[in-house]
Amino acid sequence: MAAKMILFDEEARRALERGVNKLADTVKVTLGPKGRNVVLEKKFGSPQIVNDGVTIAKEIELEDPFENMGAQIVREVASKTNDIAGDGTTTATVLAQAMIREGLKNIAAGANPMILRKGIQKAVDVVVEEIRKMSKKVRGKEDITYVASISAGDEEIGKLVADAMEKVTNDGVITVEESKTTETTLEIVEGMQFDRGYISAYMVTDTERMEAVLDDPYILITDKKISTIQDILPLLEQIVQQGRKLLIIAEDVEGEALATLVVNKLRGTLQCVAVKAPGFGDRRKAMLQDIAILTGGQVISEELGLDLREVKLSQLGRARQVKVQKENTIIVDGAGDPSEIKARIQSIKKQIEETTSDFDREKLQERLAKLAGGVAVIHVGAATETELKEKKLRIEDALAATKAAVEEGIVPGGGTALINAIPALDKLIESLTGDEKTGAMIVRKALEEPLRQIAENAGLDGSVIVNKVKESPAGVGFDALNERFVDMFEAGIVDPTKVTRTAIQNAASAAAMLLTTEAVVAEKPEKEKNPPAPAPDMY
């Protein structure tokens, strides 16, 4: 076991603070509409230029092990805020730094860290309650555009995200992909899409676009492998008599069965497209059931005692249109019973709440979106690779911010909500005494910090701006982009309540942990041994 180095008391806390400051000072230059960028070196490829707090925080490792621990504590604040709210990571870092700085001053002057911690916690509870009271519900597309524009620092991106949210509703999935061109565009996929295409290219109906479009088809959904035509012959005969088209979703269609379907398609006897079932294992069963509910059909499975040879038309699904491409299948306007679809959506929502695995949650959300509203894809375009990565990060932040805003509402942006919470905190401070009061005062001072930093990044005197906002009526804040004092809601400068709340809670949690530290243990770096001298015959 390697030897350890140990620091105590003030020396330990100061080492941690140096690390906190190195990380926070790097991150906070990005705050606000006039925040600058940070360039990150990459082992491979061009450096990455970013404006995103958590991405910068994750890149920072310091040489001194004690300082590095301090930096990692604040990094945890940024990534926790990012995980919960998806945005507000820089604000959280600035708040944590301010609380740690003020707290350490008071501890050095003899305050008791454990009682300070109590005061900090009480103060944060009051501030969070006050932020919730200020919160307004998101009303319509305009509010969403504001939230996304502020988060991404770009009006174009704001409009794009708002369009996407409007099209696919709150339950829909919005994915961000890299575009082949320099344009940033929005594509909406209506209906249910899954990533399986036609089994044979002979099944296409439009050879120019290489896709098969079936209008008003029957849909056979099964988890079996179909290899002999005898299995589905009775069903095919019924469909030919009706003069209808057929989509087969099965584990696989091969051999004689596939050959017969292709020959019939080429002769014009029966228009049929076969695709493999999406997903694997239990997830496949669940997705087939989703498709069945969406289209009003049944999954033909031996587990349910159903045999392919005895399938009736009433057990098949229906849809207004099915579009099958080389790698995707889209079912538009399935004929399922709306009440059953609703029940299925509720069941998936419950599973999302209960699951502990991020991977499972993501897959469940995809299933939910496919049932509920469809999928929007934002194709991000830029002139260079570096710009593309930076733009993609900003769009992802904007998406997270809009989802958070829809969940818990919006508050005045630009650090104004935190300043507006100070009067409520002052009432609490009056009722506290001793070090508990000092703890609450630490939070009070920290609440000014995000606005001060936004003003300083805009090249102005932070303290002057903070005092002016304090004297202004509630809801009036500083528009750093145009350098004027405005009603933040009217000007469309808003932050999601969830983002502001999470930032202050996580910052206080990390600050309280660091302030109550009395000793720090780190591994002693091993001295490199000199390599042995080479033997004479090696030359």
Curated annotation (Swiss-Prot):
It is found in: Cytoplasm. Gene3D superfamilies: GroEL, GroEL-like equatorial domain, TCP-1-like chaperonin intermediate domain. InterPro entries: Chaperonin_Cpn60_CS (IPR018370), Cpn60/GroEL (IPR001844), Cpn60/GroEL/TCP-1 (IPR002423), GroEL-like_apical_dom_sf (IPR027409), GROEL-like_equatorial_sf (IPR027413), TCP-1-like_intermed_sf (IPR027410). GO terms for molecular function: ATP binding; ATP-dependent protein folding chaperone; isomerase activity; unfolded protein binding. Its EC number is 5.6.1.7. It is an enzyme of class 5 (isomerase). ATP binds at T30, L31, G32, P33, D87, G88, T89, T90, T91, G414, D479, A480, L481, D495. Belongs to the chaperonin (HSP60) family. This is Chaperonin GroEL. The gene is groEL.
